[in-house]
């Protein structure tokens, strides 16, 4: 998805600036892992949630860090797919 946006920016003409990009929707790492298990049909192991304070990190992490994609969407007039849709397409391609 990011490669498509970069191609679009190059094709339409790059407008200088800082752009944020991620697929639509929000999820935690736990939600992401559960979706991978569900989409890939993995049943051999369990995904368990882990609170941020249980996972040591060298840098402090924000509690909520969703990116605002308004600028990239309006500048290049693009539709961004939902992360689960893109994840499903990726897993299907990997399994092909």
Indicate residue ranges for each PLM-predicted region.
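An acidic site on a long C-lobe helix of protein kinase domains
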Residues: 1-2, 28, 82-83
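Mid/C-terminal beta-alpha module of Rossmann-like enzyme folds, strongest
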Residues: 5, 9-58
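Short, surface-exposed acidic
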Residues: 44-47, 80-84
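Short aromatic/basic micro-patch
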Residues: 26, 49, 66-67, 80
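Amphipathic terminal alpha-helices
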Residues: 83-96
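A hydrophobic C-terminal alpha-helical subdomain
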Residues: 53-73
């Amino acid at each position: 998805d990011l490669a498509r946006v970069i191609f679009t920016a190059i094709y339409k003409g790059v407008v200088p600036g800082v752009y944020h990009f991620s697929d639509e929707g929000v999820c935690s790492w736990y939600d992401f892992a559960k979706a991978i298990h569900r989409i890939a049909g993995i049943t051999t192991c369990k995904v368990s949630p882990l609170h941020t304070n249980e996972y040591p990190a060298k840098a402090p992490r924000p509690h909520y860090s969703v990116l605002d994609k308004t600028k990239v969407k309006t500048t290049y007039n693009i539709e961004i797919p939902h992360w689960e849709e893109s994840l499903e397409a990726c897993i299907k391609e990997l399994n092909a």
